[in-house]
Amino acid sequence: MKTLLVMAGGTGGHIFPGVAVAEQLRGRGWRIVWMGNPDGMEARIVPQHGYETAWVHFGALRGKGLLRKLLLPLNLLRGFWQALGELRRIRPDVVLGMGGYVTFPGGMMAALLGRPLVVHEQNSVAGLANRVLAGVADRVLSGFPHTLKKAGWVGNPVRADIAAVAPPDARFAGRSGPLKLLVVGGSLGAAVLNDTVPKALARIDKAQRPIVTHQAGAKQLEALRAAYAEAGVEGELLPFIDDMASRYAEADLVVCRAGALTVAELAAVGAASLLVPFPHAVDDHQTGNAQFLADRGAAYLLPQPQLDAERLAGIIESLARDHLLDMATKARALAKPRAAEAVAQVCEELAAGRKKK
């Protein structure tokens, strides 16, 4: 049985694409082991999928605090030592880095031991760890074109239910009446969207006002309910959404941030979107992610400093369903629906090459 060591953690944008690839290879009979941080989101999500785990304590490489800088050498040393021990224990046929701080010590130790290393960069701007690992990896893959010099563009893996959503022309057929608006704030909620969207909807004549579903984040749900009540606007307000595929499929327009996984899902589904990049993302990578869709007519890009209720209301009022269908169709044309399979195939090829040596 071949063994894949997946290294990913920190955010769902790293973890869920890793799960998509892991499921591909588990279906082909591979053993899956996941390297992550025991204090990260992966510690809750990964065991739910039944994978073996290998925990490495390793945090951010960047930081302004003096203490963080002073402790960096110790942080690196501990991370390298723990990763080396786990790699020797697991003896993987292939090591796959999907992003997050833990990929750095794990990837460097994989290269040191001569284990085949695949690096996948999800964002339009490569992170620090992946920029370093690209120099020692056997294969470098990317979710966006032109991210790293020697990267093969395969797209970002998305869940099977997202990739299986019907195309835009089939979904939009027979639609009439008010537009359906889906607002997605993410697991923590996007406070600026929670504040601005109800005020924008209140500016739109009730006869034209979209039917809205707004995912707020559990901690911000009560504040969102108060904001909608104050604005005199009705909406389906949710702390989280389990079935994103169905919600995407029903929406005429999605208003959201521009994380790599979100952008990949919008393309896979074929959904028109208004993207408000998180302005404090490392290297402003969310703006680059959003531009991938916006530059090709598949999305509107609205920088957060320019976001206000009046402008948002004006954009929504100007949109007709046929134009949104055109945007959705352009988004779908940019999809890489077989990204998970492509990454899995690269792992298969490296494992086969290793056995021949």
From Swiss-Prot:
Which Pfam families does the record associate with it?
Glyco_tran_28_C, Glyco_transf_28
What is the catalytic activity of this protein?
di-trans,octa-cis-undecaprenyl diphospho-N-acetyl-alpha-D-muramoyl-L-alanyl-D-glutamyl-meso-2,6-diaminopimeloyl-D-alanyl-D-alanine + UDP-N-acetyl-alpha-D-glucosamine = di-trans,octa-cis-undecaprenyl diphospho-[N-acetyl-alpha-D-glucosaminyl-(1->4)]-N-acetyl-alpha-D-muramoyl-L-alanyl-D-glutamyl-meso-2,6-diaminopimeloyl-D-alanyl-D-alanine + UDP + H(+)
Q: Which UniProt keywords apply?
A: Cell cycle, Cell division, Cell inner membrane, Cell membrane, Cell shape, Cell wall biogenesis/degradation, Glycosyltransferase, Membrane, Peptidoglycan synthesis, Transferase
State which pathway it belongs to. Answer: Cell wall biogenesis; peptidoglycan biosynthesis
State its location(s).
Cell inner membrane
The protein's Enzyme Commission number? 2.4.1.227
- Can you name one GO molecular function term for this protein? UDP-N-acetyl-D-glucosamine:N-acetylmuramoyl-L-alanyl-D-glutamyl-meso-2,6-diaminopimelyl-D-alanyl-D-alanine-diphosphoundecaprenol 4-beta-N-acetylglucosaminlytransferase activity
Task: Please report the name of this protein according to its UniProt entry.
Answer: UDP-N-acetylglucosamine--N-acetylmuramyl-(pentapeptide) pyrophosphoryl-undecaprenol N-acetylglucosamine transferase
Naturally occurring in which organism (per UniProt): Aromatoleum aromaticum (strain DSM 19018 / LMG 30748 / EbN1) (Azoarcus sp. (strain EbN1))
Q: What is the lineage of its organism?
A: Bacteria, Pseudomonadati, Pseudomonadota, Betaproteobacteria, Rhodocyclales
